[in-house]
Swiss-Prot record:
It is an enzyme of class 2 (transferase). InterPro entries: GlnE, GlnE_rpt_dom, NT_sf, PII_UdlTrfase/GS_AdlTrfase. Keywords: ATP-binding, Magnesium, Multifunctional enzyme, Nucleotide-binding, Nucleotidyltransferase, Transferase. Residues 466-969 are annotated as: Adenylyl transferase. Belongs to the GlnE family. It comes from Nitrosococcus oceani (strain ATCC 19707 / BCRC 17464 / JCM 30415 / NCIMB 11848 / C-107). It comes from the Bacteria. Its cofactor is Mg(2+). GO terms for molecular function: [glutamate-ammonia-ligase] adenylyltransferase activity; [glutamine synthetase]-adenylyl-L-tyrosine phosphorylase activity; ATP binding; magnesium ion binding. The gene is glnE. GO terms for biological process: regulation of glutamine family amino acid metabolic process. The keyword Nucleotidyltransferase applies. It catalyses: [glutamine synthetase]-O(4)-(5'-adenylyl)-L-tyrosine + phosphate = [glutamine synthetase]-L-tyrosine + ADP; [glutamine synthetase]-L-tyrosine + ATP = [glutamine synthetase]-O(4)-(5'-adenylyl)-L-tyrosine + diphosphate. This is Bifunctional glutamine synthetase adenylyltransferase/adenylyl-removing enzyme.
Length: 969
């Protein structure tokens, strides 16, 4: 063989050892009389691989047939199928009967496959993902094979363990933690394991009885020895059991109940972090699935756990302290900008959000980072930089460990070691490699510091004002001094602020706080007081924020959120200062505090399509049959999006007309999803209606008609939904197809009831909307769901004029589009009929007078924006009158259901002068804007009598001209 052809490609410093290794290999081949014909791919990469890995060279020299076998079988040149290791190992273990034989087979198998994996990695034939995957599959195959053999042999000798409750045979469950659990095992990694068994009990079938704990402890010790003990054949995998409950001082194996009790009552923050990657890797997988379901809530809390940041920061500080103590600086795993920092970034989001966003319950860090970017929790550029750095660092780690199959993460200090690592990484020299490494680590460190940098909460490090504010909160200042400090901080009535703080400090909630919660509250308060002092009305804002704090203080994660994220605190103060309605909403539903983290999304109001996509995406994480969780998520979604609209509204980002639009879009999206859930529920219980044309609500023969503010795109905060339900069932239509069939009319009635239930039922997260169905034919005495023909007949023959007025603002909003189109055509037919103008004017005037007498609260120097003379209702009645009076000659007036566009239509048709139309539209907008502002301040829609005087006079004049003057058009 001509080995010399490629030696010159190595750095000169590495060539001497390589020449020596090649000579020894040649000698070993000749001694064994082995064929020395190697494939071109093997020869081309041999010098590269051996130059970078003494481990590969040594094993090829010791077992010269190994390389020939790997290339002859083709295994060296291809990735394995997922079950290759299991099948191959099973064949080799067929005839063994002792632990000694098992240990020999496993070690030789491991050495052979490790040579193959390292070769493919260093040669550039395997991606990092392939290396991770195959190393993890190799470990699992060895674990499962060893456990199966040992369990069989031990049960033959000591009997089979049985559960005392189930009476069934018991098997051990092995959890893989860390890199093994995440399927990210490195080239010379320990495997972190936890052993468990389902139930307590005793063995059967042997002379001596053992309890299950003793049985499985013996089995665990044998398994560890078979894998971990170093013999002349080497080892299989080093086993680390320190992640088990109570670590080295805890039992080697624990029952499921003991595991659950430990993590519920004693589990520490770092154990939550470790459990993220836990996975069943060997033993009884079915029982293991139950165990993982029991343990999942320990890592993934149902609420947003912002305390995780503080815990991970503490863990990182402990690691850094230990590295300093040992004098280690160049550790690519634990050092600054290293592998662990990338993992901490991803896993911090998992700990915080994973309970709410089950899609984040992934183990692999690259997948987690990608999901975080997709969900806008992490900027895309940050994801790209972190993923690139992680891949680079893991490749460095593999090359460090490939050299001698040693578990090391320290960069070499010797010249030869540095030359070898740079060469193995594909760089011309150490300086070029070190520069690339430093750039990756710098980027990781920047992202890590941005997320984990401790906020300036240490009172001793605060500027003077915050120190003094802390003393005010803690009660360390005399009253006069406290008043002076608060006054200097911007408070106009510091006495009132002192009373508010005293109320909170002495409240039962604060006195009952845990030590950790009290520390977090004490850190937060000086920052909070400073931020509130900078608002326009600090005392008012402080009262609102204090009420919220008292509500959430027991959930320390929220205190951590506000303390850890200055932006969240800033937005909270800003919104509470602007609107008591928003403050009240945040207090009732603290989960919304998460929305304060990112002002970009907080003030970014979504359109209809984006809302629908966002809701669909959110519901994908919930099982389709879990209606309770679906209802909860709908409420969270509605509250979150309403908060965004309100935040954009009070800060002037969103104009008034857009507020109504977006609140209407939100209601429509929720209506459609609620109808879909209702339809699925009915179909599941009673089967699909044979008369419906498909599986979805859009083909159901059921339509939801929106009236009033929903129909007119004018929903406000807390608006009811005025709904009418229609169906297209015909007499004689067959019942539904299920085991509990329903007549179509009954089916549709149940569908309407279920929809109202989903929208209106109060849950721990509140309700979605109040639903008003009184505008249906015959009102509360009529059927909840009407057939389209019956509805048409009612509108033609029985409906009052006020019901036709209401029809002006009616439109199809959800359900069967064909039925919706039929309703739209019918609406145009009804509204487009010619009416007696005198009778119409009289009936509209009479209804308006009746409403005003009952509802107008214009008294005592106040004007009712809605019902007062010249107010909102007068404009709405003018619009409705105009449509009913003129649409027969101007059908274009029926195109839109909202007042502004109808007024524009009046002007375009010459029915009103442009100035008159504009005057009404401007007054309508001004009234609604004022009512909306008052709503945000939780005030009634009334203003001082002197406001809007010109607008009111103008509206009344137009009212008189159109509806009082007998010569009106």
């Amino acid at each position: 063989m001509n080995w010399q052809a490629n030696i010159h490609k190595l750095p000169a410093l590495l060539q001497g050892r390589l020449k020596n290794d090649l000579a020894r290999f040649q000698e070993a081949l000749e001694q064994k009389n082995l064929d020395t014909v190697f494939k071109a791919k093997t020869l081309k990469t041999l010098c590269l691989v051996w130059g970078a890995s003494e481990f590969v060279a040594t094993n090829c020299i010791r077992w010269p047939s190994l390389l020939l076998d790997l290339q002859g079988s083709g295994n060296l040149f291809r990735a394995y199928e997922p079950n290759h290791y299991v099948k191959s190992l099973a064949q080799q273990l067929t005839n063994i009967s002792t632990e000694t034989e098992l240990m020999v087979v496993l070690r030789r198998f491991r050495q052979r496959e490790m040579v193959r994996i390292v070769w493919r990695d260093l040669a550039g034939w395997a991606s990092l993902d392939e290396v991770f995957r195959e190393l993890s599959q190799l470990a699992e195959a060895c674990l499962n094979s060893a456990l199966a053999c040992l369990h069989y042999w031990q049960s033959q000798a000591l009997g089979t363990p049985y559960g005392s409750i189930s009476g069934k045979p018991q098997s051990m469950v092995v959890l893989g933690m860390g890199k093994l659990g995440a399927r990210e095992l490195n080239l010379s990694s320990d495997i972190d394991l936890i052993f468990a068994y389902p139930e307590s009990g005793e063995t059967r079938g042997a002379q001596r009885t053992l309890n299950n704990e003793e049985y499985f402890i013996r089995l665990a010790r044998r398994l560890i020895r078979v894998l971990d003990e170093r013999t002349e054949e080497g080892f299989v995998f080093r086993v680390d059991m320190r992640l088990r409950p109570d670590g080295d001082s805890g039992p080697l194996v624990a029952s499921f109940n003991a595991m659950e009790n430990y993590y519920q009552n004693q589990g520490r923050d770092w154990e939550r972090y470790a459990m993220i990657k836990a996975r069943v890797v060997a033993g009884d997988c079915q029982a293991g699935t139950r165990l993982m379901a029991m343990l999942r809530p320990f890592s993934y809390r149902r609420y947003l756990d912002f305390g995780a940041i503080e815990s991970l920061r503490s863990m990182k500080a402990m690691i850094a302290q230990e590295l300093r103590r040992q004098g280690i600086k160049a550790n690519i795993k634990l050092g600054p900008g290293g592998i662990r920092e990338v993992e901490f970034i991803g896993q911090s989001f998992q700990l915080i959000r994973g309970g709410r966003e089950s899609a984040l319950q992934e183990r692999g860090i690259l997948r987690v980072l990608t999901l975080l970017a997709e969900r806008d929790h992490l900027p895309y550029y940050a994801k790209e930089e972190l993923c690139a750095a992680y891949v680079f660092l893991r490749r460095v780690e593999h090359r460090l460990q490939a050299y001698r199959d040693e578990q090391t993460h320290d960069l070499p200090t010797s010249t030869e070691g540095r030359v070898r690592l740079a060469f193995a990484m594909g760089y011309r020299d150490w300086e070029a490699f070190a520069s690339a490494l430093e750039e990756h680590r710098r980027r990781v460190q920047e992202h890590f510091e941005q997320l984990f940098a401790a906020p300036h909460m240490d009172i001793t490090d605060q500027m003077a004002q915050e120190k003094r504010l802390a003393e005010v909160w803690l009660g360390g200042e005399l009253r006069e001094a406290s008043l002076a400090v608060l006054s200097a901080a911007g408070y106009r009535a510091p006495e009132e602020a002192v009373q508010t703080l005293m109320y909170l400090r002495q409240s039962y909630t604060v006195r009952a706080l845990s030590a950790q919660a009290r520390i977090r509250l004490d850190r937060l308060m000086p920052l909070l007081l400073g931020a509130v002092g900078r608002t326009e009305y600090p005392e008012q804002c402080l009262q609102r924020v204090i009420i919220l704090l008292e509500t959430v203080a027991q959930r320390t994660a929220y205190l951590a959120l506000l303390a850890e994220y200055p932006m969240a605190l800033s937005q909270l103060v800003k919104l509470c200062a602007a609107s008591p309605l928003i403050a009240r909403q945040l207090t009732r539903y603290p989960l919304l505090l998460d929305e304060l983290l990112d002002p970009r999304s907080l003030y970014q109001v979504l359109g209809y399509d984006s809302l629908a996509e966002d809701l669909k995406w959110s519901l994908e994480s919930i099982p389709g049959d879990d209606l309770e969780q679906q209802m909860e998520l709908l409420r969270h979604f509605c509250q979150r999006q309403t908060l965004r609209v309100a935040a954009a509204d009070v800060t002037g980002v969103l104009p008034l007309m857009k507020v109504g639009d977006h609140l209407t879009y939100l209601a429509e999206v929720i209506l459609k999803k609620a109808l879909e859930l209702s339809w699925r529920h009915l179909v599941h219980r009673h089967g699909r209606l044979q008369s419906s044309t498909g599986e979805q609500p859009e083909e159901s023969g059921f339509a939801v008609i929106g009236y009033g503010k929903l129909g007119g795109y004018e929903l406000g905060y807390g608006s009811d939904l005025d709904l009418v339900f229609l169906h297209n069932a015909k007499p004689g239509d067959p019942p539904s197809e299920g085991k509990k069939p329903l007549d179509p009319v009954v089916f549709y009635s149940r569908l309407g009831q279920r929809l109202i239930h989903i929208l209106q039922t109060s849950t721990p997260s509140g309700k979605l909307y109040e639903v008003d169905t009184r505008l249906r034919p015959s009102g509360v005495s009529g059927l909840l769901v009407s057939g389209l023909d019956a509805y048409r007949g009612y509108q033609c023959m029985q409906a009052w004029t006020w019901e036709h007025q209401a029809l002006v603002r009616a439109r199809f909003v959800a359900g069967d589009a064909r039925l919706g189109a039929a309703f739209t055509a019918m609406r145009q037919e009804i509204l487009g009929r010619q009416r007696d103008p005198i009778k119409l004017r009289d009936e509209v005037r009479h209804m308006r007078a009746k409403m005003r007498n009952q509802l107008d609260r214009s008294q005592g120097g106040w004007f009712d924006l809605k019902q007062g003379r010249g107010g909102i209702a007068d404009i709405e009645f003018i619009v409705q009158y105009g449509v009913l009076a003129w649409a027969h000659a101007h059908p274009q007036l029926l195109e839109y259901p909202d007042n502004i566009r109808i007024l524009e239509g009046f002007a375009q048709a010459g029915l009103l002068a442009s100035e008159e139309s504009q005057l009404l539209a401007d007054a309508y907008r001004a009234y609604r804007a004022a009512a909306n502002r008052l709503n945000l301040q939780t005030h009634e829609a009334r203003v001082e009598e002197g406001q809007f005087r010109q607008e009111r006079i103008a509206v009344q004049q137009l009212w008189s001209a159109l509806l009082e003057d007998e010569s009106a058009k």
